[in-house]
UniProtKB/Swiss-Prot annotation, chain B:
Annotated protein name in UniProt: AP-2 complex subunit alpha-2
Signal sequence extent: none
GO cellular component labels: AP-2 adaptor complex; clathrin-coated endocytic vesicle; clathrin-coated endocytic vesicle membrane; cytoplasmic side of plasma membrane; cytoplasmic vesicle; cytosol; endocytic vesicle membrane; endolysosome membrane
Protein's cellular compartments: Cell membrane; Membrane, Coated pit
Compositional bias annotation for Pro residues: 668-677
Gene behind the chain: AP2A2
Organism: Homo sapiens
One GO term (biological process): synaptic vesicle endocytosis
Annotated residues for binding of a 1,2-diacyl-sn-glycero-3-phospho-(1D-myo-inositol-3,4,5-trisphosphate): 11-12, 43, 53, 57-61
Similarity comment text for this entry: Belongs to the adaptor complexes large subunit family.
Length: 148, 939
């Protein structure tokens, strides 16, 4: 299972964090700081996987934003890399060519989309249509209720 | 997609975020945040009741502040209030705040649980989804108590919507992970397994994750999932790339689900033949697809395809039973080793590490040695180089050890600091393990000290000293080599330590050469003295007093040194005391007393290598176990030839760090007694004892595993969700030694851990087993080792049973497996010419001496594999003996304590009929019978 997912910028600003295992605030901060340092220090052509503590880290950079997942020893690195890509595709489809600013200003939406896609550290649905349909319905619900 | 109502629902939030982004400095940002926090606090505390919208907005702001890295200590109550709003967006934000910010031990859980209960009962799928998400995010025990009974019902109810089923499956999985005891198994489990057949692939995907985790802990209960998973997988891999519509990802059909199904299958041993055939087809299809031209140039296509491929290879390695698939997997990984994608090279190196431990593919892995060495030299990414080091370590055996050690040493000169220590440990272990020639070992370790002295830990240099002391054939060489190495103007302090110790013990062996006379040796060491730290100086002082005994002619010189103020009045207590005592000793003691007190060090008793222990500590126990298993020497297995001295395999204790070589402060050195023999205090297996508690019946799958060990000596004998049992064994004539490794796979201690060996009444007189009890506590993640000494008294048929009992988290565990000690282990191969063979064959023509079996092939009929198996079985494989080149003949002698039994065998394959005829002829009927049984099961 995935232990956590982080989105952070090239400047080391955390944009999103999702933890799938109970972790204390203090420990979270320490891990985020440590891992960001490791990942930001890596050069472009390097491989997307690394061993970190007792976990495997899979990361990929999209424009100014790093998407970084920590998974367990038995988990599949390549499918995690594509999981990141699918999430980026979902964001892209929803926001219409997504950029870092979209995620900053609409961080709650970024969370909702992630939650439709992953739950408890495992993939809930890999179909782009299903995930987006769920989000669309929620938006619709929001508008209807807004009007009421 | 409708234009998103980004933020215009919450203008205040957007403004606040802009403000923060416009802050010029960290101070300005903190100021702005504090202002906002004060504002929100006053709003929350104010007299005026807030409307839902404002609450939502402020809660959202708090979330944003939290994401910036600030602590949030209020607002939880308001978020909980939002949960009971009937406006969807307010409810949603409330749940988001709680799932991000609420820790599992919050006092609010009861209130939250109430809201969740209402939403679960609402039958509104969107609300139910939110509630399930919240449970999965927080996942506390209290939540498990409240909902673990409810969620399975939601999951298997006929009228539950697919999306809710998916959430329910993963939610239950989360609760099971944190509180397995609270999730009751029941009728629902069988219905969950049938979700693997569900039409909705999203449901299957979520359910597979749940089933995999449940099956790891309750394999029996979820056994039926194997055939369902195989047929599902088969439908996916054979589908056209468009069949699965939205579940096709860049032309790869359902890659996530495929990976999960392959993962689920790794919870089980290879399935029954019927299902197995279908699975093998799937795996072959996956391997074939890797060779097809890509359907898209996009990296996503190849990543998804290869994700499935790597998982399939993991399954093949896990089963470790299909030589063809293993070799194909190895070839595929070999291709990836040279791929232009760094990611694939990394993964191929990683995956090959585990392949190296399989008997069938070890040789195939070894053929890639040059590529791996090249990776070590040319990869630009340190994490890839690290993998290359791991793989070299895993593929090392006696045949390539000199090359691998040399390459690692040369890499060490430029290696990244972060991995130097690990490489040093690995080199030290390999050099020791595969040393045929101990001069090579000594050279290697001295090179290690020269190249990376700072990274050579105490364990490593203690070890070289132990080995030199225990092996008298290398002592002279060691003394000469350290003497030469010390000539360098600047040498590492570790070298001074090793040099000091070795010359102190064995300097006499080179003193005959005028170039290394006692006085020169002394001056050489003493020239380094003042540059060294206190512990090293203390060690050198001991060397000096040893010199006084070895070389009476330098006694006055040494006494002068000891007498000097810088020694006798040294500020360091330890140095001063040694100087005083040694000086006194050299003055008052007679030559005889000196010779007794300063006698050569006795051999060190053998124990587990402290270096290996250190590497395990560095890498975590599980990883090294695998590596350790892989390092067994196959050349010995395969040739069945005489084994080299076993001294290299296990190891020795370490002297204490302050290394009081003489033990002058305490008792005089103990006389060099032999290391305690395991027989002396060994616990005889008492088969007649009826006090033993009830022994569990043999574990399922134990038969299969047993058969796998007939032709090999190492590997995993048993594995369930708690315990892994690995074996390493070696046999020589009628004696053998088996190392049993018990690995605790959990994070919890095993208590009262008691493995017992049981021989039946029939077996007991024929097979002698001796072992010592192991420590009754096995820490979580730890591994303990037990050594069994084996003596074959006379030929035997049955196998001993290993029963293991222990307590795990309050429950009593009882496992029995057959221990693969079979008659053929005591085979010594015999080479003979065709003429001799047939002459003996005729001599054994008495009907009782021959046993024949005609049987159907259970595995693909591959000549090379068959040869390897016959050799693994222990007999010699005689080439050009049988007039029909397709037949195999073998010969060997079974050694027992009482007698030796010559054995001849002939295996005639019939490819068309897919049958074999196996004929055994020996001088003893029971032996023919047993060997025929054992060998027939292998093809």
């Amino acid at each position: 299972m995935m232990r956590f997912m982080l989105l952070f910028s090239r400047q080391g600003k955390l944009r999103l964090q999702k933890w799938y295992l109970a972790t204390s605030d203090k420990e979270r901060k320490k891990m985020v700081r440590e891992l960001m340092q490791v990942v930001l220090a890596r050069k472009p052509k390097m491989c997307s996987f690394l061993e970190w503590r007792d976990l495997k880290v899979v990361y990929k950079r999209y424009a100014s934003l790093y998407f970084c997942c920590a998974i367990e020893g038995q988990d599949n690195e390549l499918i995690t890399l594509e999981l990141i890509h699918r999430y980026v595709e979902l964001l892209d489809k929803y926001f219409g060519s997504v950029c870092e600013l979209d995620i900053i200003f609409n961080f709650e939406k970024a969370y909702f989309i992630l939650d439709e896609f992953l739950m408890g550290g495992d993939v809930q649905d890999t179909s782009k249509k299903s995930v987006l349909k769920a989000i669309e319905q929620a938006d619709l619900l929001q508008e209807e209720m807004g009007l009421a | 997609m409708p234009a998103v109502s980004k933020g215009d629902g919450m203008r205040g939030l957007a403004v606040f975020i802009s403000d923060i982004r416009n802050c010029k400095s960290k101070e300005a940002e903190i100021k702005r945040i504090n202002k906002e926090l004060a504002n929100i606090r006053s709003k929350f505390k104010g007299d005026k009741a807030l409307d839902g919208y404002s609450k939502k907005k402020y809660v959202c702001k708090l979330l944003f502040i939290f994401l910036l890295g600030h602590d949030i200590d209020f607002g939880h109550m308001e978020a909980v209030n939002l949960l009971s709003s009937n406006r969807y967006t307010e409810k949603q934000i409330g749940y988001l705040f709680i799932s991000v910010l609420v820790n599992s031990n919050s006092e609010l859980i009861r209130l939250i649980n109430n809201a969740i209960k209402n939403d679960l009962a609402s039958r509104n799928p969107t609300f139910m989804g939110l509630a399930l998400h919240c449970i999965a995010s927080v996942g506390s025990r209290e939540m498990a108590e409240a909902f673990a009974g409810e969620i399975p019902k939601v999951l298997v109810a006929g009228d539950t919507m697919d999306s809710v089923k998916q959430s329910a499956a993963l939610c239950l999985l989360r609760l099971y992970r944190t509180s397995p005891d609270l999730v009751p198994m029941g009728d629902w489990t069988s219905r969950v397994v049938h979700l693997l057949n569900d039409q909705h692939l999203g449901v299957v995907t979520a359910a597979t994750s749940l089933i995999t985790t449940l099956a790891q802990k309750n394999p029996e209960e979820f056994k039926t999932s194997v055939s369902l998973a195989v047929s599902r997988l088969s439908r996916i891999v054979t589908s056209a790339s468009t069949d699965l519509q939205d579940y096709t990802y860049y032309f790869v059909p359902a890659p996530w689900l495929s990976v999960k199904l392959l993962r689920l299958l790794q919870c089980y041993p290879p399935p029954d033949p019927a299902v197995r055939g279908r699975l093998t087809e799937c795996l072959e299809t996956i391997l074939n697809k890797a060779q097809e031209p890509p359907k898209s140039k996009k990296v996503q296509h190849s990543n998804a395809k290869n994700a499935v491929l790597f998982e399939a290879i993991s399954l093949i390695i896990h089963h470790d039973s299909e030589p063809n698939l293993l070799v194909r997997a190895c070839n595929q990984l070999g291709q990836f080793l040279q791929h232009r994608e760094t990611n694939l090279r990394y993964l191929a190196l990683e995956s090959m590490c585990t392949l190296a431990s399989s008997e069938f593919s070890h040789e195939a892995v070894k053929t890639h040695i040059e590529t791996v060495i090249n990776a070590l030299k040319t990869e630009r990414d340190v994490s890839v180089r690290q993998r290359a080091v791991d793989l070299l370590y895993a593929m090392c055996d006696r045949s390539n050890a000199p090359q691998i050690v040399a390459e690692m040493l040369s890499y060490l000169e430029t290696a990244d600091y972060s991995i130097r220590e690990e490489i040093v440990l690995k080199v030290a272990i390999l050099a020791e393990k595969y040393a045929v020639d101990y001069t090579w070992y000594v050279d290697t370790i001295l090179n290690l000290i020269r190249i990376a002295g700072d990274y050579v830990s105490e364990e490593v240099w203690y070890r070289v000293i132990q080995i030199v002391i225990n092996r008298d054939d290398v002592q002279g060489y060691a003394a000469k080599t350290v003497f030469e190495a010390l000539q360098a103007p600047a040498c590492h302090e570790n070298l001074v330590k090793v040099g000091g110790y070795i010359l102190g013990e064995f300097g006499n062996l080179i003193a005959g050469d005028p170039r290394s006379s006692p006085l020169i040796q002394f001056h050489l060491l003493h020239s380094k003295f003042h540059l060294c730290s206190v512990p090293t100086r203390a060690l050198l002082l001991s060397t000096y007093i040893k010199f006084v005994n070895l070389f009476p002619e330098v006694k006055p010189t040494i006494q002068d040194v000891l007498r000097s103020d810088s020694q006798l009045r040294n500020a360091d207590v330890e140095l001063q005391q040694r100087a005083v005592e040694y000086l006194r000793l050299s003055t008052v003691a007679s030559t005889d007393i000196l010779a007794t007190v300063l006698e050569e060090m006795p051999p060190f008793p053998e124990r587990e290598s402290s270096i290996l222990a250190k590497l395990k500590k560095k890498k975590g126990p599980s990883t090294v176990t695998d590596l350790e298993d892989t390092k067994r020497d196959r050349s010995v297995d395969v040739n069945g030839g005489p084994e080299p001295a076993p001294a290299s395999t296990s190891a020795v204790s370490t002297p204490s760090p302050s290394a009081d070589l003489l033990g002058l402060g305490a008792a005089p050195p103990a006389p060099a007694g032999p290391p305690p023999s395991s027989g002396g205090s060994g616990l005889l297996v008492d088969v007649f004892s009826d006090s033993a508690s009830v022994v569990a019946p043999l574990a399922p799958g134990s038969e299969d595993n047993f058969a796998r060990f007939v032709c090999k000596n190492n590997g995993v004998l048993f594995e369930n969700q708690l315990l892994q049992i690995g074996l390493k064994s070696e046999f020589r004539q009628n004696l053998g030694r088996m190392f049993i490794f018990y690995g605790n796979k959990t994070s919890t201690q095993f208590l009262n851990f008691t493995p017992t060996l049981i021989c039946s009444d029939d077996l007991q007189p024929n097979l002698n087993l001796q072992t010592k009890p192991v420590d009754p506590t096995v820490e979580g993640g730890a591994q303990v080792q037990q050594v069994v000494n084996i003596e074959c008294v006379s030929d035997f048929t049955e196998a001993p049973v290993l029963n293991i009992q222990f307590r795990y988290g309050g429950t009593f565990q009882n496992v029995s497996v057959q221990l693969p000690i079979t008659l053929n282990k005591f085979f010594q191969p015999t080479e003979m010419a065709s003429q001799d063979f047939f002459q003996r064959w005729k001599q054994l023509s008495n009907p009782q001496q021959e046993v024949q079996n005609i049987f159907k092939a259970k595995h693909p009929m591959d000549t090379e594999v068959t040869k390897a198996k016959i050799i693994g079985f222990g007999s010699a494989l005689l080439e050009e003996v049988d007039p029909n080149p397709a037949n195999f003949v073998g010969a060997g002698i079974i050694h027992t304590k009482t007698t030796q039994i010559g054995c001849l065998l002939r295996l005639e394959p019939n490819l068309q009929a897919q049958m074999y005829r196996l004929t055994l002829r020996t001088s003893k009927e029971a032996v023919s019978q047993r060997l025929c049984e054992l060998l027939s099961a292998q093809f």
